[in-house]
Structures are given as C-alpha cells and as structure tokens.
Amino acid sequence: LDNVVKPYPCGIVIHPLIDAAIALSPRVGDSGRIVRIAVDCHPLVVELTGNSAPRTGLQARFSAVHGIAAGLVDGQVGLPQYADARVTAADLTWLRGMIVLHVDERMPRDAVRIAVELDDGSQVVQAIDHARGSMARPMTTAEVREKVANLVEPVLPGRTEKLIRAVDALEQSNDVRELAEVVAR
C-alpha cells in the first residue's frame, strides 16, 4: 500500500502550498506588507480546493488560499488554523484576497512555486519539489510523534507518551490491553 501520514488537517493537494507558505513566513515577516501572492500549482489544486472564501473550518480544509494565508501569518498549520473563528479572522480573510492561483499543467501534484510581492517591490519566492508527508518526502518518526501529541493531548491529557509506547509495543505483541487501558481511562 502507498500510505502516507498527512502533516496537515486538510486536502492533501494543499500540502505543498502550506509547506511553501510556512517556509516563506519568517522571510516575509509582516504580512501587512504583502501586495500579491502568485501561486503556480497543479490543476487539481484549483479543481479540488479552489474555495477562495471559506466561512467555516470545514470549508477551509478545502481551500488552498486559506492554507497559504494561515501558513504565512501563523507560521504553522494545524487544527487551530481550521477553527471557525480563525477562518473568519480579518487578517486571514484579507490575505486570502491577495492570492492568485495559476494552473501549471507541468507542475507535479506534490510541488508548488509561490512568489510573494511586497510593498517595496521586492519578491520572495519559495518552491517545493515534494510536499512533506508525500511518498518522496515522508514524515519522520519524530514528526509523526509530534502530530500524535498535538492531536492526543487535548483529549487525553497526560497520556500521550503512554499511548505512543503502547502503540509501539504492538509490533512485539498481540496484546492490546495496555493500549485499551490508556485510551479508556
């Protein structure tokens, strides 16, 4: 099976765009200086995630421009960036309006090129050849564990490490009791 672990809680075609936006975030600095954002992307990005004005967290999960805006402004993209209040926040709503998606038929599915034009006329560019979490660039064990911690800790506080150990132990044992105990408490 060709399975991967997704780093972001949204449509997978958005992942290279988010990678690029997060990489651009410290280089751009103040997002208020952005005049325009040009995105060269695979056709499926527009087809599947072309919602330019999401109003809810669910809609934003299928919005390429939301993923880019959140990555640029917040420097990270996780569940908090898909909360309804964050989706409708003025800074992200404004920035989404600056983003133009250009379909490039030659662009691989897990690649992107983003050019951010700033108010002084300068341009900051980031290309991603393979999205993090893709078959060509899978998440590391440490990244997967961090994702698990971010997802588990809010619902099973203080049990993240025990849960990870119990899952790791499954390879050596057919006994799932320890795992069941961790999640049942």
Kindly label every feature range from the protein language model.
Residues 1-185:
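Terminal-appendage/accessory-domain detector
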